Amino acid sequence: IHTYPQCRIFLFGGGEKETEVMNRWADTWPEVCNASAQLKGLQQELILMSHLQVMVTMDSANMHLASLVHTPVVSIWGATHPYAGFMGWNQNPTNAVQVDLPCRPCSIYGNKPCMRGDMACMNQIKPEDIIQRIETVLKQK
């Protein structure tokens, strides 16, 4: 956040616990907005997504929604794999952040427990790799 003070960060989605965390982040950093608490309905979310320079998301509905409004997506993949056919429509595969492990994908839909017990597919993803992909997308704008 401090490296890019001109950037605004909008947080989407989440259940009750996630919403509490997103509210705390929005209260802590003025550059962060909990969009899920501010917007009323899918149409408003799509409008906001269509104005983003980049959407950072896991393999989720938000990845697909951002894709539908032509927003570049940096997607984070753990148990699932984009080659299973769930990559966002018209998205650049190089923006899929993931680690290659012999146990991946362990679930087509991401709903099975980790067979290794260590969630290496997520824990081995470095924040720096995600930031690098974001910076690459922003430089292309």
Question: What are the residue ranges of the model-derived segments?
Answer:
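Nucleotide-sugar donor-binding patch of glycosyltransferase catalytic domains
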Residues: D27-T28, N34-A35, S67-Q140
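Donor-binding and catalytic core of enzymes assembling or modifying cell-surface/extracellular glycoconjugates
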Residues: I1-A79
